[in-house]
Amino acid sequence: MTASATPASSLSTPAQRLAALRQAMKQHGYDAWIVPSADPHMSEYMPEHWHGRKWVSGFTGSVGTLVVTATTAGVWVDSRYWEQAAAQLAGTGIELQKLGKVRSHVDMLADTLHEGAVVGVAPDMLSRTAQRQLQQALAPKGVQLKAETDLLDGFWSDRPPMPTAPVVVHPAAFVSETTAQKLARVRAAVQEKGATHHLISSLDDIAWLTNLRGSDVEYNPVFLAHLLVGPDSATLFVNDTRLNDEARAALRSAGIALAPYEQVADAVAALTGSLLVDPLRVAASTLQKLPAAVLAVGEGAAAAGSLPAGATTAGRAAANAANAAAGASGAANASDAAGATNAPAATGQTARVQLIEAVNPSTLFKGVKSAADIAHTREAMAQDGAALCEFFADFEARLQKGEVLNELQIDELITAARARQPNFVSASFGTICGFNANAALPHYSATPEQFSEIRGDGMLLIDSGGQYLNGTTDITRVVPVGTPSAAQKRDNTLVLKAHIALSTTVFPDGIGGPLLDAICRKPMWQHQCDYGHGTGHGVGYFLNVHEGPQVISWYAPVLPHAAMREGMITSIEPGLYRPGQWGIRIENLVVNLPVAKPEETDFGTFLYFDPLTLCPIDTRLMDTAMMTQEEIAWVNRYHALVREKLAPRVSGAAKAWLEARTQPLPG
C-alpha cells in the first residue's frame, strides 16, 4: 500500500484523519469509502486493531458505519447512539445519520454516486452477505464495489497490533461436552446440508467448539482464529505461539491440526468438494481467493433469510445486540441458494469447491445449553448476586455518610465486588452506569473526560455483568438516590409491568422470539410509551454476553433457526428513556424450560422463562397503585427466591441490605 502523503504525526483529530482518508481515496481511485464496525470474524466487539471507524470519526459507540465521499461524510447509527454520536461528531465534518429517520448508507451511495464510480471497503471488514447486498444495490446504477485493500493501513501509523494474549483450556470441571463430541455433532449437521467441509470464522463458535478461551476481545473470552472442519480432520488457523502445552494437547486429542492464522484463505482456495459457510459470519477476505464462479453463488438473489440491502446494521441494532442479531439474521436454510456450482471461472480457473450457505450449526448447538451448563450458570448467578448485595450495601452506606461518588467509581466498586467471588475472570461488558439524564442514553459510557457525580435526587441505572469460569452474567437495576419523583416511579413501574408481562409468559417450543416482543411492550404501549432497542438477546456460557441465534425484538425477522428452544438463556430488558431527564431498564436473565405439569399435551411442548438472575428489584421505585395483584405477587415470589438463594452467601451489612430490599410488597 502506498503511504499517504499526509504525515501520520499530524493526524490527531477526526478532521485531520478524514482529510487523510480522502487523500488516500483520491490516490487510489475511490469515489466513496465505507468503514463498518466489523472485523474478519464479523464480531460485535472487536480487537482495537479493527476500530478504524472509531479512530477516523471519533464516535466511540460499539455499532455504526462511516461513509466518506469527496464532499460528504456521515456515520449511520441507530437510536441508542443518537445523542452520543451528535456530541462526538460535532465539529469533525462528519454528519450524524439517524437510522430509521434517513435512507441507509447503501441507498445513499446508490442514489448519489455517478455511473462508473467506485466504492471501496476493506475486505476483512465486510461479510459475504454485506458484500452481496452492496453489489446488488450498486451494480444497477453502474457503480462498482471493490473490496481489495484497507486504505487506513496507509496512514494509520500507530494502528494497534493484532492481539497476542495466551489461549487456554476451559477447565474440565466446567465443560459438559468434549471437543470431539461437539465436532461429531457439527459434522453430522454439515453432512445434512450436503457439504463435505465447513469454515467457521465466528470467534464464539470456535471457542465453544474447541473448549478453549482467550482474551483477544475485551470482555469476551475469545481468540482470533478460523476453524476448517472436514469429514475426518479439522484445522485451527491461529498464531500457535499463544497456545500452551495443555491447549495443544487438547487440540491434538480432538484431531485438530494447527496452521498459521494468515493461511486460511489459501486453504479454502485449495479445497475440493463442498464448503458450508455462514454468509453473515465469514469475511469477504477469507473467500476472496476462490474462483469467480464459486463466489457467484447466491448473487442473483439475497441468500435465504438475509436482510434487505442496507438493512443489516439496522437489524442488528434493533436486536440490542449486534452480533446476536447478526446470528439471528443468517440464511438458516440456504443450502438451496448454492445454485451456481462447479462452472469454470471466466479467468480460466476451475471451480474446485461448491459453496453452500447456511447458519453455522454450532450457533444453535451453542445457544442451547446443557443441563450441566445451566447448573453451572445458576451457581455463577448466585455468586454474582452475592457480589451485588455487597456492592449495593456499600453503595448505600457511602451515600448515607454523605460521600459523593461518581459513575466511574461505581464501575470500580461493582467490579471489585465481583472479583472477590470464586471463578471470576472479568466484566462481561463495559459497565453502563448513568445518573439521571445520562441514563437516558441506553449505551452510555462514563469516561475520565465525561462523567457525573451522584448527588441530589434522582435515579441511578447500572447495567453490568461478569465473566466467570462457570457462566456469564448480565443485569440491569435502577435505584433511587434521594427522593424519587412520582413521574419517575410511574415510569419505573411501567417498565416493571412490561418485565413481568414477558417473564410470566408461557409459549410454544419453537416460536420465533420476535413474536414475544409485543407481550413485553403491551403494558407500555397502553400508556403510549416504548423503547428503541430490542427486549432480549441470547447470552453465552463463559462466552459472549450477546449471543445468537435467538432474539426478542419485533425489529428482527422471524427465522426458523432462531426459534426459542429449551435450554436457551435470554435476557428480558424493557426500558423507558426520557432524553435529558432519566432512563430506566430492568434486566434479568432467564432460561427456557418446559412447563412442569402441563394442563394439555395435544398441542406440543410449552416453555416458560425460569429466572436465573438473583438480585432485588428496588421496591422504592414501585407505585403499587399501578400494579395488579398478580404483578405484586410476582415481585414477592421473585424476592423470596432471591432471599432464599443469597442469604446463605452473604453476611453483615450485605445480608441486612438483602433482607431490607426483599421485604414483601403489601397487597
Locations of the language-model features?
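Active-site neighborhoods and metal-handling regions in enzymes and metal-associated proteins
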Residues: 1-667
